[in-house]
Regions:
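Conserved mid-core segment of classical short-chain dehydrogenase/reductases
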Residues: 97-112, 135, 155-158, 198-202
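Active-site helix of classical SDR
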Residues: 126, 162, 170
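Short C-terminal tail/terminal secondary-structure segment
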Residues: 2-4, 97-100, 151, 231, ...
C-alpha cells in the first residue's frame, strides 16, 4: 500500500499505461488500493504491465485502445464501468512526441496525426469519462499536457498546438463540471526519463546533457514523480484544486 494515498474501493483508468508515466501512474493507483483499468495501443506492453500488477495482487483490467478512435475509447470506458461498477479517477496520458520540423515544411498529415492522438484523444477520453462521472455526481480527471503546453520551442509547432489544446480542454471542462462534483486538471511534465525520451535521445532528437542542464534542478524527472502529482490531483487533499495546469518540470517554466 502506498502510504501517501488511500484509494481503496475506488476505480481509476489510465491511458497509455504500457510504459513510462502511464505505467508508473497505474502502478501508483494500484498500490494505493484502487482497481485500475489500463489501456494502451501497444498490446505487448499492455499485457506486460497487466501481468506485473496482477502478479503483485492488484485488481486490474487491461484494454487495448487507440485513443484516436472515439469508438474504441467509448468501449474502453464503458467496459471499465461495466467491470468495476464505477469510475472515480482518470489519467488521460496517451500521447506521442515527434521529431523537429520547420513549421513551413511540416506536412498536414503529421499535424493531423499528432493532434488526433494528443488532443482529440484526450478530448474523447474526457468526454466519455465525464458521461459516467456525471451520472455518479463525482470524479477526478487529470489530462496530460506538457511543458510544451505552457511554452513554445522551435521545430515542434504541431506538438505544442496539441499540448496547448489539452490545457484549453481542461480549463473549459473544469469550469463546466466543478459545480457537478467533478474536478478536471492537467499535469504538465517537463523532460521525464521515460522510454519515449530515451528513444528520442537514441535518435539524436534530444541531447540528454542539454536537457539536464536546461532544468534548474539539473536532472530529468522520473515517471514516478509524475505519478505522485497525478495521484495528488485526484486525492481529497486537492479537493479545492480545479482547472489548473500543474508544471512538474524541475523549475523550467519558473526561470
Amino acid at each position: 500500500m502506498n502510504p501517501s494515498f488511500d484509494f481503496t474501493g475506488q476505480v481509476a483508468l489510465v491511458t497509455g499505461a504500457g510504459a513510462g508515466m502511464g505505467l508508473a501512474t497505474a502502478r501508483a493507483f494500484a498500490e494505493s488500493g484502487a482497481a485500475v483499468a489500463l489501456t494502451d495501443i501497444d498490446e505487448a506492453a499492455l499485457n506486460a504491465a497487466s501481468k506485473e500488477l496482477t502478479d503483485a495482487g492488484h485488481q486490474v483490467l487491461a484494454l487495448s485502445c487507440d485513443v484516436s478512435d472515439e469508438d474504441q475509447v467509448a468501449a474502453a470506458v464503458d467496459h471499465t464501468v461495466e467491470t468495476f461498477g464505477r469510475l472515480d479517477m482518470a489519467y488521460n496520458n496517451a500521447g506521442i512526441q515527434i521529431p523537429p520540423s520547420d513549421a513551413a515544411d511540416e506536412p498536414a498529415e503529421r499535424f493531423e496525426r499528432v493532434n488526433a492522438i494528443n488532443l482529440r484523444g484526450v478530448w474523447a477520453c474526457m468526454k466519455h469519462e465525464l458521461r459516467h462521472m456525471r451520472a455518479q455526481g463525482s470524479g477526478a480527471i487529470v489530462n496530460c499536457s506538457s511543458l510544451g503546453g505552457l511554452v513554445g520551442l522551435p521545430g515542434r509547432a504541431s506538438y505544442h498546438a496539441s499540448k496547448h489544446g489539452v490545457i484549453g480542454l481542461t480549463t473549459s471542462a473544469a469550469l463546466e463540471y466543478a459545480p457537478r462534483g467533478i474536478r478536471v486538471n492537467a499535469v504538465c511534465p517537463g523532460t521525464i526519463d521515460t522510454p519515449m525520451v530515451s528513444d528520442m535521445i537514441a535518435k539524436g532528437e534530444l541531447d540528454r546533457a542539454d536537457a539536464e542542464a536546461n532544468q534548474p534542478i539539473n536532472r530529468l524527472g522520473t515517471a514516478e514523480e509524475i505519478a505522485q502529482a497525478v495521484l495528488w490531483l485526484c486525492s481529497p487533499g486537492a479537493g479545492f484544486v480545479v482547472g489548473v495546469a500543474l508544471p512538474v518540470d524541475g523549475g523550467y517554466v519558473a526561470r
